[in-house]
Amino acid sequence: MLSHKIKRISLYAGIAVAVAASIIGACWVAVDVNASGRVYDDVSQVPAMRYGLLLGTSPVTPRGTHNINFDNRIKAAAELYHACKVRYIIASGGDYRRDAEGNAVLYGCDEPRQMQRALIAAGVDSTHIILDYEGTRTLYSVAKACKVYGLDSVVIVSQDYHNRRAIRQADRYGLYAVGYNATPSPEAGNVVRNTLRETLARVKLYIDLWFGAEPQFASAPDHK
């Protein structure tokens, strides 16, 4: 009798795992297919638009190590600017220097300000950089570009996997978006972490779409 119960539980567990894996796989594939033909590795192939949207990143990881993804996103955004593919860059991220209780966060970062400094160092005119402090999620960055800044088209700058997800979110708002891919980190640990994080983020994307999650913004538009 006990053996029969164990077998039944194992069967149900196996079915649950299979269903979960199928859902995760479907979310991943759907995001990739949707962005097909709209992500670019060659800056010369990127269609010119007025605005670029640089998705939030910090120069330092939560472990206190240098973040290669930050360097590569800044490089990609500067390439777009210097190639005259975008005129303005929205540096969208969050200020993570303090937690919800106001305590200083070890290795915390003011992402928009750090991105601004790095972009200026890369030769981007400071008057062509817009700081967005409400980009604490990709959804918020994309939604604000459309709903607050009033954009109807944008070049998104991040790594390939991130760009594809952001494009799917842009489609929801009728915002025409393409992605310019920053070079991914070559470190094996980063690849594993980013893949796991992206897998969960893509599932969360479709949960947000299903339930109609809508961010609310406090700041007024400040763009050219």
Question: Locations of the language-model features?
Answer:
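A transmembrane-helix-recognition feature enriched in membrane-embedded lipid enzymes
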Residues: 192-214
